[in-house]
Amino acid sequence: MAQGWRQLDVGVIGGGIGGMSVAIALRRAGHNVTVYEKHDFAGEVGASVSCAANGTRWLHEWGVDVQKGDPVVLKSLINRDWKTGEPVSTFSLDDYEQKWGYAYNMFHRQYMHAMLKDCALQGEGAGPPAKLLVNHACQDINLKAGTVIFKNGVTAKHDLIVGADGIGSAVRGILGIHPAKRPAESSCLHANVSTDQAVKLGLVDYSQNDALEYWGGQDGTWDKIVLSPCNGGKLLSYYCFFPRERGDYTTQAWGADDRPVEELLAPYPELDAQVKAHLAIGVEVQPWRLWVHDPYPYLQKSNVCLLGDAGHPMMPHQSQGACMAIEDAAAIGIIFNKSYFQGDVREALEVYEKVRLPRATRVQAAAAKAAYNINERIGFSANKDNCATYKVEDEKKTLTIEEMNAYDMYKDVEEKLTQVRGEKFLAPYVSGLPIGLQMPNGVIVGA
């Protein structure tokens, strides 16, 4: 086994949020990074993206200028009655930052991406700036040689290759993972609403709540509206779910022609009139294709690993997709830093898989449950005493804020490293959680 830290030449396939995050993490760890983006620009499509404390902490640790992303700092989660709009379940986040050390941010996806890209590529900050090459679509990888072959005829050899190329990952298939995916039982249309326009029309100003707001989700049906404020509250991002038989968009990709607003309103004859009036002025109405992926058997092979949606695509109902990609990036940055990396890429990737696969798989499963039961969603899952319609599949297995935010990735990495190296781990932690930590559902870590 190689001994001692060495600087690696790293290739990152995919220039989205996950790709830029891992470029920053590896840059901070002292490595040379090239990001390859298949399109002629590195950007993002979509609208709002949620970044809870378990994601935000890494942005701060990496020195990202979070204010560039123009975030909304969330103060509560509100679940409203489908017909009346009255709150059914509310979870306060007033002491969230004080308790967990970092804010719960909502970003516009494009702003968040620009914020990360600037940090990865700029001259300021620790580590060599990452390089970005566009129009480089991955065609194949020679796993023995560590060489990436691109569709434009270029080849590039790297010590480490990170597949951050999203839900339709090419790298995933090259590693031999061919998922059996199936359409979700719900469809989703997304729309943006200008707060200024809503206020001028005399509609409710939801931006004042600084909240993630939900209509429905309590009765086991697929009907649900999710409101995410972003751009400092200037933009309201609506995700509108309904049974797939009322509209199947599995063959339509985001970025095609906008759907008519009448199509957005049609599934909801009994929806709360106040939020329905917001949807009526919605623009950029786009379908979001939803697919259910079973957990993948592994995340790495040879000198290649998967990150984010390439490695563990999940339903959006825990608002943890971006955070899981950021955590993946953080894990790679830690494992390959000067404290832990001893020069052996294979060992490091084995540790990465041991750290990330169980946690991401757990969130993946919890997101699927929250699709039809809002009480399974982090936050609401601890609201048993404050919600008359509270019901979950198994209270002992619910995902909680404590499990997400009390997690110490450094301790998890150390534990998995000792396992791989045949050493003893003595710190009072289990998979990054402190022994003795009591969850709201009564579960005690290590008991």
Model-identified regions with their sequence ranges:
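Accessory recognition modules or surfaces
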Residues: 2-11, 38, 42-54
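C-terminal helical "tail/cap" subdomain of flavin- and related membrane-associated enzymes
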Residues: 2-7, 84-87, 318, 334-447
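Residues at the starts of beta-strands that form the adenosine-phosphate
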Residues: 9, 32, 235
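Conserved mid-domain beta->alpha element of the FAD-binding
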Residues: 12-32, 36-39, 162-163, 189, ...
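Residue-level detector of high-confidence beta-strand sites
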Residues: 38, 90-92, 135
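Active-site-adjacent segment of FAD-dependent monooxygenases/related oxidoreductases
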Residues: 46-119
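Acidic/histidine metal-binding catalytic segments
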Residues: 70-73, 131, 266-284, 342-350, ...
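Conserved FAD-binding catalytic core of PHBH/FMO-like flavoproteins
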Residues: 86, 103, 114-283, 296
